[in-house]
Amino acid sequence: GIYLPSNPCDFIKRLKEPEFKADIIEPEEEKLLLTKAERSKANWLKLAIMLGVDCGMRRGEIIKLRRENVNFINATATLLETKNGTSRSIGLSPRVISEMRKLPINIDGRVINCPSNDNFQHFYSQLQRWTGVKKSFHTTRHTFASRCAMNGWSIAEISAQGGWKNLSILKRYTHIKATYLSEKLAN
């Protein structure tokens, strides 16, 4: 072996993780997005936003969701193709079930008639321009996690619904406002 009098990497400083920008979709922004989405050529866009905000679903999970994996009676869905490769069952909100029933049944069995992530992004970007709401679709998951936390859901419940395997990642998604905390202290 080669003898080195000191570690040549001693002078290298470890990079810090960048500060994470907390962002959620405010209720008035959500209302605007849903209203304009209803007028979009993409008849599935309103449902997609609801699935993100109400159910914490990822874009890819929404695109791949099949009608045969939705239980309308129990208001649940089984997501077979998820980001981390494990399937999970989730609850669906009443307004998601209602909106889902309005959409036509697609020949290929998918709940939304969107062929790809690119197509999804095209219509969502168009919606951002129409509304002036510059928050990414992924922000719907932050919104979901934050609202659930403020509504008293346990970490286990939020994690099970949203598919987070790592508590530190889930923590990055949950943004509790100071005004909410002050209201809790007042009660």
Language-model segments: what does each one mean?
Residues 3-4, 154:
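Conserved hydrophobic residue
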Residues 11, 32-33, 64, 98-102, ...:
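Short, solvent-exposed alpha-helical surface patches in well-structured domains
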Residues 35-45, 55, 90, 105-111, ...:
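Short, basic (Lys/Arg/His-rich) helix/loop patches that form interaction surfaces
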Residues 32-40, 71-115, 126:
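Basic, alpha-helical nucleic-acid-contacting "clamp/cap" segments
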Residues 4-59, 63, 73, 83, ...:
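Basic, Lys/Arg- and aromatic-enriched nucleic-acid-binding interface segment
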Residues 20, 24, 81-85, 95, ...:
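Catalytic-site neighborhood detector that most strongly recognizes the C-terminal catalytic loop/helix
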